[in-house]
UniProtKB/Swiss-Prot annotation:
InterPro entries: Pept_tRNA_hydro, Pept_tRNA_hydro_CS, Pept_tRNA_hydro_sf. Monomer. The keyword Zinc does not apply. This is Peptidyl-tRNA hydrolase. It comes from Thermotoga maritima (strain ATCC 43589 / DSM 3109 / JCM 10099 / NBRC 100826 / MSB8). The lineage of its organism: Bacteria, Thermotogati, Thermotogota, Thermotogae, Thermotogales. The gene is pth. Its EC number is 3.1.1.29.
Amino acid sequence: MVVVGLGNPGPRYAFTRHNVGFLFLDFLKNKDWKTEKYFAWNKINLAGNEVALVKPLTYMNLSGLAMPHVLKFFSASLDDIIVVYDDVSLKLGKIRIRKKGSDGGHNGMKSIIQALGTQEIKRIRVGIGDKPEGMDLVNFVLGEFSDEEWIILNKVFEVMKEALEVILVEGIEKAMSIYNSLEVRA
């Protein structure tokens, strides 16, 4: 399995809502990242399986540029990939696991679908909450989580780790049936 977390590189974006994919990977393993030309990577063991963690080093909207390199580097197929990214249409505390689908308006996922030529890409969408009325969407997704939101987000990351283990052991359908209806609260 190769878990690709989406985000923007650099300290300016490190803790923003849009970087929830990177933040989840750091939750799983926050040290000793190695760097290739188009991505940073690491490995962990989940449910007795070696799992690669990947952060594209392009900006979010160009995430797809890294994907052919990721597939080649890890000798992976499309079926091995799971993409993790933020979803402004989901409430903070909720995740959605899917086997395939459209980009849903997410430019990072749009870039990946275009680069790989298919929508048949497994993904975990992470709710980052509704933007406040009157606030610009860009300012919201590039804003940082509050202390209260971090409490929820860390619990969400624990649930996501469990979900990855279920995907590895029992398959994505089982994980979808368990986790898509859950809502994590503080």
